[in-house]
Each structure stands twice: as structure tokens, then as C-alpha cells.
Amino acid sequence: MIGMLESLQHESDLLQHDQIHTGEKPYECNECRKTFSLKQNLVEHKKMHTGEKSHECTECGKVCSRVSSLTLHLRSHTGKKAYKCNKCGKAFSQKENFLSHQKHHTGEKPYECEKVSIQMPTIIRHQKNHTGTKPYACKECGKAFNGKAYLTEHEKIHTGEKPFECNQCGRAFSQKQYLIKHQNIHTGKKPFKCSECGKAFSQKENLIIHQRIHTGEKPYECKGCGKAFIQKSSLIRHQRSHTGEKPYTCKECGKAFSGKSNLTEHEKIHIGEKPYKCNECGTIFRQKQYLIKHHNIHTGEKPYECNKCGKAFSRITSLIVHVRIHTGDKPYECKVCGKAFCQSSSLTVHMRSHTGEKPYGCNECGKAFSQFSTLALHMRIHTGEKPYQCSECGKAFSQKSHHIRHQRIHTH
């Protein structure tokens, strides 16, 4: 107590300090009417409305409006969890999360929304979702927000202001924190680590999405069929299977796709890009996942076994398709003629018999094909490649079926 009195050298300091004990809060925010016992707390609070963020994280560049917010944020890097539950041992980095967790043991829910079960301190902000209160409106387009900071960020869409530029690739950003996050791509810095498996990420958002793999959380649900996803972008892409929307079009052949990644992979057909090479046999692939699957041919590994007939497969997708032989399930039906297939890829190829589409063109002679595998066989006419050799007489063939037919000469 003596130490406290010694530190309060001025009468004004003592009077202000006494307000902590009396509960008096004479300092009111003119934006939201929240009151404070100390003037410096009001000054810090006002930064939430002005959007001022003066405290920067040295790890990832995120800026916070208050020192206390920065201190809490730093725990996401250090992994420090100072608040431990004496009931179950679970630890937390933030006090409010710890206090909220304890209510699971006591059953206490003192601040509950009448619409859904959400507790303080988020209830006031959350209730605006029900009341529709959005006092901060954009003068350009009229869009309204429930916080001034959200409006400030939104307004940059109209001004196009991006003052923070990457000196590696020239990409510009509206906020410094976005630039610092982006620069992790160039530096390879991954400050956000998963506590479950140790995988590290350059951005916190990516870590949050990744952690859902461990928790099983899938917050984005399709209203059409009920299927749920761990990230919003996956839901948006999935919904196109219901709407039929294909916004990404190939400039070479006009083929449209529902996802940008599908278009990127398709475009490699035209440029002939195959960056992934098998170090065993030299076969090259357009996608890394195809190379990984191909490796099982050399290792002989087949971890997925059919519980009906015992047949084993190197890929789980192959097992799923195989099981349909036993069940007779053919979930992919042609809307034109009604023919059904057990694989979506088979339906895609079949549809080309109706549309006449031949997206795979030969770079040598221009002949086009409906399937990539047919193009690959055709290319051997130009290259002279004959990978199938008869062990009896040494004669070689470009196609496996020709090789098998030839071998019958020796067996008869």
C-alpha cells in the first residue's frame, strides 16, 4: 500500500485512482457512450472507432489499437496459455475465453441472446445481427456497417488506396499488415504453427482453416444438399454444382470451369506443361497429386482393401469406385440419354459423345480427341514410342492391347 501511495505523487492522480475503487466512470465515449474510470482508458478505447492501430506485432506485422490487445495477440505466436482450468486442465491464452469455458462446468449463462446461445462480451455486437443496427454508412455506395473501423476499411475499395507495395513482386495492399503477411510467401517465414501436428503456416487464417481438419469442424453448410465444408471458398465452389455456374473460361478452346484451379490445370493441356517427373520411370505429370499416386505403381503399396472380395488398391478413390461393382451403384446419370456411370469422369467423357467436344488437340497434326488418354496413344505415332515389348521375340508395340493380342501367337 505504501508503494502505491508513493507512486501517486499528485492529488489528481490519487483522485483518479480512487475511482477504480468507488466504481465512478466520469469519462464517456461520444461514439458509443461507454464509460471509463481512467482517462487513458478512454483514449485507448477511442482508437477502436478511429481505426488507429499504433501497436505492431514484430512476428507477423499485425497492428493493434491497444497494448493489451497486442499482448494477447503475441500469445498466438508463443503458444503461451496462462489461464488453466482447475476442473479439466484445459488451458487458454485469453482470460475471457478461460472464464467463458468455466461456465461449461457450472452451467452458468448470464449473458444469453434470446435468438441463439452466445455469451458476453460478444453479445452486444452479436445482437446487431438481429436488430440490423448499422449506424456507419458508406457515402459512395450506401453500404452500412455496425463498426466505424469496418467502414474505414470498406472505403478503400472506392478510393483504390493501396499505399503498401511489395518490393519483391510489386503487389500493393491497403494495409501494412496485409503486405507483411504477403511477404511471408517470398521469405518462407511461417510463424503460425499447429499445436496438433506441427505444420506451420505463413498466415493465421490458413492455420485456423487447417485446425478444422483436427477438430472436424465444418461451419459452411450447403442449403441445397446439406453437405458441409471447412472453408467458405469450398462451399461457393460446391454450390456451382447445383447452379451449373462455370465462370472460368479457357481462352484457347472456350471450355468453362466452376473453379479457377480446374481452369489452371486444363490450360496445361494446351501449353503441354508437365512439371512433375517420376524419378523411377521418367513419366511426367501435370499435377503433383498424380505423381504421388503414380509412385504406388513402383512401390506396390496397396493399403486400401475391399471387404467384399479382398482386392486391394493404391488409392482410396479407386476402392470407392470398385465397391460400386458389388453394390451396383451408378450415381452419375446422363441427362440426355439416361445412361448411368459409377464414376463422374466416365460421365464427363460420355457427355462428349452428345456434344461432340474434343478438347485434347495434337500439337503435331492438329487432330483432336475427347479423352486425354486417346491423345497420349496418338502421340506415339509421331514420337515412335513403343513401350510394350514382347519377351519372346522382342517385337515392340505402342499400345498395350496390341501387345496382348500379339502374345497369343506364341501361346497357341
From Swiss-Prot:
InterPro entries reported in the protein's UniProt record: Krueppel_C2H2_ZnFinger, Znf_C2H2_sf, Znf_C2H2_type
Family: Belongs to the krueppel C2H2-type zinc-finger protein family.
Zinc fingers, C2H2-type class: 27-49, 55-77, 83-105, 136-158, 164-186, 192-214, 220-242, 248-270, 276-298, 304-326, 332-354, 360-382, 388-412
Protein species of origin: Homo sapiens
Coiled coil: none
SUBUNIT field: Binds DNA. Interacts with GATA4.
Record's note on what induces expression: Up-regulated by activation of alpha1-adrenergic receptors.
PANTHER family tied to this protein: IP01015P-RELATED
Functional summary from the UniProt entry: Transcription factor that acts as a cardiac regulator and an effector of alpha1-adrenergic signaling. Binds to PE response elements (PERE) present in the promoter of genes such as ANF/NPPA and acts as a direct transcriptional activator of NPPA. Also acts as a cofactor with GATA4, a key cardiac regulator.
Any one cellular-component term (Gene Ontology): nucleus
PROSITE patterns on file: ZINC_FINGER_C2H2_1, ZINC_FINGER_C2H2_2
GO BP: any one term: regulation of transcription by RNA polymerase II
MF (Gene Ontology): DNA-binding transcription factor activity, RNA polymerase II-specific; RNA polymerase II cis-regulatory region sequence-specific DNA binding; zinc ion binding
Gene3D superfamilies: Classic Zinc Finger
Protein name listed in UniProt: Zinc finger protein 260
Pfam families: zf-C2H2, zf-H2C2_2
Main location class: nucleus
Cellular location(s): Nucleus
SMART domains xref list: ZnF_C2H2
Keywords assigned by UniProt, alphabetized: Activator, Developmental protein, DNA-binding, Metal-binding, Nucleus, Repeat, Transcription, Transcription regulation, Zinc, Zinc-finger
